[in-house]
């Protein structure tokens, strides 16, 4: 899983979009590990290790921190939104990758500056993370849930 991020960095992340994509990948990996390990690990320590390991030279490390820590701070609210948007999927039954990609996507959709991260960018980036780290149907699932939430908050 980490190798993909490391390869992304090695091929050269020269623009803000690529840097943000790498930051999202690092945030997702950190949230995944915290979700998997629970109280055995500290999210901030995991995040700092992942930034060092997968993002050496990454200019905007604050974006990865903002995402991971923002998701953690708002996780209960975000999880309730997921449960409303996908009632047939209790949060604990959603694949751990998909669950954390949804959390990042919803955090960006709901809590981020819309000028900095337009909703369509937040949704597309979440779909890309799902395709990179998730299963065969992850992209469609993420798209469906985030699309549902986007329609609800747009009305």
Functional labels for PLM-detected ranges:
Residues 2-139, 144-155:
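N-terminal interaction/assembly modules
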């Amino acid at each position: 899983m980490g190798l993909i991020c490391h390869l992304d960095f090695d091929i050269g992340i020269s623009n803000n979009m690529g840097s943000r994509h790498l930051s999202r990948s690092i945030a997702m990996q950190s949230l995944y590990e915290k979700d998997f390990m629970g109280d055995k690990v500290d999210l901030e320590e995991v995040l700092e290790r992942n930034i060092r390991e997968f993002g050496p030279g990454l200019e905007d490390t604050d974006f990865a921190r903002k995402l991971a820590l923002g998701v953690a701070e708002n996780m209960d609210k975000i999880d309730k939104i997921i449960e409303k948007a996908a009632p047939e999927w209790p949060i604990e039954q959603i694949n751990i990758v998909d669950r954390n990609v949804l959390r990042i996507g919803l955090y960006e959709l709901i809590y981020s500056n819309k000028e900095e991260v337009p909703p369509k960018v937040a949704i597309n980036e979440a779909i890309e993370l799902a395709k990179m780290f998730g299963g065969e149907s992850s992209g469609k699932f993420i798209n469906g849930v985030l699309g549902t939430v986007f329609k609800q908050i747009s009305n």
